[in-house]
Amino acid sequence: MNTGNIVTDSLVGYWKKAAEDRGIEFQSEIDIPMEMPFRGVDVSLILGNLLENAAEAAEKAERERYIRLKIKYDKRNLLIIVENSYKGGLVRGKGEELRTTKADAANHGIGIPSVRRTAEKYQGTVAIDDAVSGHFVIRVILYGLSTEKVT
């Protein structure tokens, strides 16, 4: 992985290897510059949470086990799409927010809410699509409205 963006390259490289070690097919399509108007720690939080969740879910899938990652930067906006296979149904809480299915729920289930909070820093959005059984898609858009350059 060599996009020139060290934060993204490191995280994607780590999760690609972790997925493949678990027998999960990992595909990525990444088109981003070295510098973007988003803090590296924020992009790391989003990517790390999404890819960790995807790897955990895909590992439990019965048939196809895959993760597909697309990251695109265009006109100061960043689009991150993660698709993955999973088994079973999603559990939703109040407000349709996803809930963890892990037994130790008190120590889990903070990933997607933290992704939402981070996206909101950039007036961004998080959309989840699980309309197709066994196929989960999450889309995160960050808007680079500031003229300040952040690396």
Predicted segment positions?
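Glycine-rich ATP-binding loops of the HATPase_c
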Residues: Q123-D130
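Short beta-strand/loop element within the Bergerat-fold HATPase_c
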Residues: Y66-R76
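Glycine-rich/acidic phosphate-handling loop/turn and adjacent ATP-lid/helix
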Residues: L78-G109, K149
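Conserved ATP-binding N-box helix of the HATPase_c
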Residues: G40-R63
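Glycine-rich nucleotide-binding loop
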Residues: G88, A131-R139
